[in-house]
Amino acid sequence: MSLSTLKREQIKKDLKDQEFDVVIIGGGITGAGIALDASERGMKVALVEMQDFAQGTSSRSTKLVHGGLRYLKQLQVGVVAETGRERAIVYENGPHVTTPERMLLPMHKGGSMGKFTTSIGLAMYDRLAGVKKAERKTMLNAKETLEKEPLVKKAGLKGGGSYVEYRTDDARLTIEVMKRAEEKGAKVINHTKSVHFTYDSNEKVNGIQVEDQISNETYPIKAKKVINASGPWVDEVRSGDYARNNKQLRLTKGVHIVIDQSKFPLGQAVYFDTEKDGRMIFAIPREGKAYVGTTDTFYDNNKTSPLANQEDRDYLIDAINYMFPDVNVADEDIESSWAGVRPLILEEGKDPSEISRKDEVWEGKSGLLTIAGGKLTGYRHMALEIVDLLSKRLKSEFGLKFDKCATKHLTISGGDVGGSANFDKFIEQKVEEAKSYQIDESTARHFASKYGSNAEELFKIAQTAQYQETGLPLDIYTELVYSIQNEMVYRPTDFFIRRTGKLYFKIDDVLNYKEQVIDVMAGLLGYTNIEKEAYTKELQIAIDEAQTGNHQPAVKE
């Protein structure tokens, strides 16, 4: 067992009893990356997350490990080069959560992308991002473009470009990084909120006071250094520190909608112009659905649950019907949706899409280190930068010496599959192995492709599972038990949203099996009646919010 919910009390005891080199506030991809880098260098690491891991921005993205093509349009050449390098590393270290996918870029008369400039742009992108030969761009005429995706608007079509993006499961990427950090010695816990900082006699930060959001217990965590990696909450967290700088975040909201392929039979991922504002958005097929996004609007409301409002849904439906006019989707065709908040660094006078996605590290007089901004793709490099600085400070202030960054070739949990080139072969081997556990081929394939080298753990659970009396199918029961024992799942929403993505891509499973899942969790985790009622209600609210056009203004009223 690694990140086991069943070991929660022991983890809390370790957090109370030990002094750490660093405690990290925030369990999204940024915090997870820092925990992995620091623990791999030999540092004693603690991490707390007030909600579930990846519950903020890190489960609400476009679910792409970008190569950074959009930054080329803004002539951010260095960003494209670094993003391309990092994308290759992310893929190599975790091919079970990252998949190369051909993206079609249709070009229309009067659109933002001309054929000549697109060809040059994609060629530059291939070079800067270090794209593998087999994945380099190809230019297409109108006929070839329609062969790739017949639903694309024919009127004014000049041709298209085809290039490769990498599709990911952002929340699973985060949890796999977190699990590897724990294997390297980090003590990590979710549903635990940092309430305030503690200071030594020289007014230097020397830890945090936390509150368990499940039991309401409060306790201190002692650490030589504190890193604030709380994403959209960065400003709130450091407002509790007396020594903050005058920089601040500007939040923008991005919304995605999900439509069944029976209504929107998209065969190919497409990156396309919108009619209204000239922005570009994605339409991506996944697991029998097509998801479309994203919007980009300023946001200053509830950060814990940003919602897709009717205006967001209308914008995306209009965009689909503009680029795919034969489809005729309507609001009632939306099965599910999600909204995320981007924690960008404020740049006065810029539109949401113009604000840089770069990250910055801020150091307060108290010694508090804060990391702000950044992108999913760059998580490893962001961690490298801040842990280099942390290492420097631990040496100068405490005389401690640590190794250099060693995450470039470090697989994440589940990533020990013999490299990305071997992943397909690995899956076939696992499917064969599963026969000895009496597991059918499609279940075995699902476990192997989703959990990588951890698949055998699921095979073992499935082999002895007494699942029939629970009313759950074998795959859902197995994943539920695995996620409680290894991925710190405590609430039904943790399981249905962030460990499995079912609320977005298989909402029927949530609707059909929610009561049975809650019953199994109540039995395994010892829910009180009050907890069971609260978590049932919380899940129903999440379902309602995903399915409907919510009234949520951009700014609190």
Curated annotation (Swiss-Prot):
Enzyme Commission number(s) of this protein: 1.1.5.3
GO molecular function: glycerol-3-phosphate dehydrogenase (quinone) activity
Keywords, ordered alphabetically: Cytoplasm, FAD, Flavoprotein, Glycerol metabolism, Oxidoreductase
InterPro entries attached to this UniProt entry: DAO_C, DAO_C_sf, FAD-dep_OxRdtase, FAD/NAD-bd_sf, G3P_DH_FAD-dep
Signal peptide: none
Cofactor: FAD
Binding site for FAD: 21-49
Annotated compartments: Cytoplasm
Reactions mediated catalytically: a quinone + sn-glycerol 3-phosphate = dihydroxyacetone phosphate + a quinol
Pathway info: Polyol metabolism; glycerol degradation via glycerol kinase pathway; glycerone phosphate from sn-glycerol 3-phosphate (aerobic route): step 1/1
Any single Pfam family the record assigns to this protein: DAO
Main location: cytoplasm
One Gene Ontology cellular component: cytoplasm
Name of the top EC class for this enzyme: oxidoreductase
GO biological process, alphabetically ordered: glycerol catabolic process; glycerol-3-phosphate catabolic process
Family designation: Belongs to the FAD-dependent glycerol-3-phosphate dehydrogenase family.
UniProt protein name: Aerobic glycerol-3-phosphate dehydrogenase
Species of the source: Staphylococcus saprophyticus subsp. saprophyticus (strain ATCC 15305 / DSM 20229 / NCIMB 8711 / NCTC 7292 / S-41)
